[in-house]
Amino acid sequence: MKSFHLVFTAFAIAVTTQAIGQAPKRPVPAQPKKQIVSKPVRLTPQPAKPQQATNPVPAAGTAAKPKSPPKPAIKSFPRKTQKLNFIGGDQVLLIGDGLVEQAQKQGYLEYRLMVHNSGKKLHFHNIGWSGDTPAGIARDGLGTRQAGHEPANEGWLQLRKQITDIKPTVAIIGYGMARSLDGSTLEQFKSDYQRLVEHIKGSAGKKNRLRLVFMSPIAHEDLGGKLPSGEAHNIVLEKYREVIGDLSKEHDAWFVDLYRYLKRRKGATTPLLTTDGIHLNEYGYWVMSSAAEFSLNLMATNFRFGIMNNGVERNGGYGIKLGNILPAAKGMTLDGQFDGLPPYFALEKKGKPFTQKTAIGRIQFMGLPEGRYTLVADNVEIHTADAKEWSGGAFIDAGPDVDQAEELRRLLVEKNDLFFHRSRPQNQAYLWGFRRHEQGNNFREVPMFDPLIRQKEEKIFALNKTAKRSYKLMPADDWEKIKPSETAKKSEAIAEAKPFKTQPLPRFDLGEGLEVNLFAQNPHLAKPIQMNFDAKGRLWVASSEVYPQILPGQMATDKVIILEDTNDDGQADKSTVFADNLLIPTGIEPGDGGVYVGQSTELLHLKDTDGDGVADDRRVVMSGFGTEDTHHILHTLRWGFDGRLYFNQSIYIRTHMETPHEVLRLESGGVWRLRPETLKAEIFLRGFCNPWGHHYDEFGQSFVTDGAGGQGLSYGVPGAMYFTYARAPRLLDSVSPGRYPKFCGLEIVRSSHFPDDWQGDAITCDF
């Protein structure tokens, strides 16, 4: 490294023993003796038969292999016989690790519990936290001190306060996965769990009796490839499951045995339930909600009915009340009202694997003449099929009740977003932390989320009811003639750009032989935070309108923008909004067929799967990153020469990351690295104030800049600890200490665009 140049630049059930592959089948009401009842149509897989040990006969001339000792059967926990009754006004606490935290983004669990309680005002408070334990270890960031300087029990104190403020009357607890991965003992987990339950009991609201629900962790799913199989981990998880099951009996709690209900059998062809083996995907959360519904003795809101060609309803129907059945020459009309909104699965592009598993119901029309028929409700198409399919029972997954169900779930997710910003706002260090006096009284904005949450809840309560529908079965050709014209599909809505004038270039003091050109000026570039080029020469930019923190009532509208120079004139002439509705994206790096984006608590991978230039696949790769200071959160994404993805965090951030291999915790600045194909992450470097620059020389050696502390440039030694790391026994000094500006960004020059004597030098910016 010859010299340093300072350059100013402008500028993301399975089959179980209870057969919960979807909502449990609605039982057929008891019938009088000798009454003819149609054979029930099962909406769920048949219950799995107990697996029997087999003793194959060895081939002639071969010795029988010694038998391995049989694996002991896991302990059985009979389902509680009482139904969990909710009471209007219940304050429902959802607390746990990443299992519970990610549930708020799907809304399926809350939705299932809501539709069973139409007319009751239930208030859900999800305070799940990735990497957390019953001791609240991940919550010390809610305190007032800098990361690494808080007392050892700060997380527990903050967890106690959160629970006390909510005053729960129903508590749903979902701990175990993080603890099973961090090397803790079962005895410590049980002790912490007992203490947590006792505090919940002591903090419970007095109006309604406290009801407890304990959820086990899910099983570690074997996804194949280079990910861990989970076999060894499941042995540990079974022990956590047993502890939680025993505690549920001790505390008279409902036990939701997710480990057993969601464990896929080896070789099963059912859809995958997780994204990485330990975190549920959308379908996994839908199945989880079915398991909870079953465990709480809540009858699933699926439906089924059958009608003869003479208009007589067949026995054995459930979930819907029918009336005014009038047969016609080709079809019939009838009225119907569901008992409750259906358990709709909202994943787009479901495909055949989900068709029957996630159907909300099944309808039979017997004795129809040959031909194709369409069923509509309130002039909304439900299903089109031929007479044979209708006679056998058509699976239903559409209609006005489905539309209403999805709207209700959407409102629940939006309410959860508001509560997240209220209970765990970004930029805590400046809201109530040790730097709260530096930016004015921003904390006054936090309670402003409360009325917004109440408004969203009132919409939820009003929508949570079924309506009587007018159904009509008619020839499909007749429907084609009268159905409402399909609204032309609109392109993705983009806010109209405000008129702007070309801005004059600022005056730069340039070195000899250098010039500055304007590459792009774009109204969507609100606050560009990081940018990186891909192999096609396109510039990917993470742009934020929300930074530094979301305001009450503000929507998360941040974007990933692709800028292209298609005619090689040195200026971008094409702009594409690749992704929006992001929350303060602070890091971006193209790769693996899409782009990695650091936003809020997550590292995302966004991908365009249909070739329209817009991301339609969004995957959470890692979560649990701290947000105590939004210019410290996950940033500086860059591919390493070793094929790993590197990314940084700054001094005030506390990260508690659950991976399929282990739980990783970093409560300080530092540099991470991740091998995406195995999801094996590690802390590469610890320390720094604001490590906003990281790059490699031609030998793959790392160099890191610091935006504070006068450290200049540091040589990255794997595993080393640097200035500010609070718990370091020894710190590695910078290679260029001195009174520098606050460095932001780092490039090591290997380009003919720069003079020969710059090659191999480091360039950076002033913050």
Question: Where do the model's predicted regions map?
Answer:
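Alpha-helical cap/lid subdomain in secreted, periplasmic
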Residues: 1, 81, 85-88, 107-125, ...
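Residues that mark the start of a beta-strand
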Residues: 91-93, 123, 538, 761
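Catalytic nucleophile-elbow at a beta strand-turn-alpha helix junction centered on a G-D-S/GDSL motif
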Residues: 90-105, 130-134
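N-terminal pre-domain segments of enzymes
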Residues: 23-89, 158, 446-509
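Short, flexible loop segments at the rims of nucleotide/cofactor-binding pockets, characterized by
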Residues: 70-72, 146-152, 232-233, 516-518, ...
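Beta-propeller domains with acidic blade repeats across secreted/periplasmic ectodomains
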Residues: 478-767
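Bacterial N-terminal signal peptides
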Residues: 7-15
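Boundary at the C-terminal end of the N-terminal hydrophobic targeting segment
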Residues: 19-21
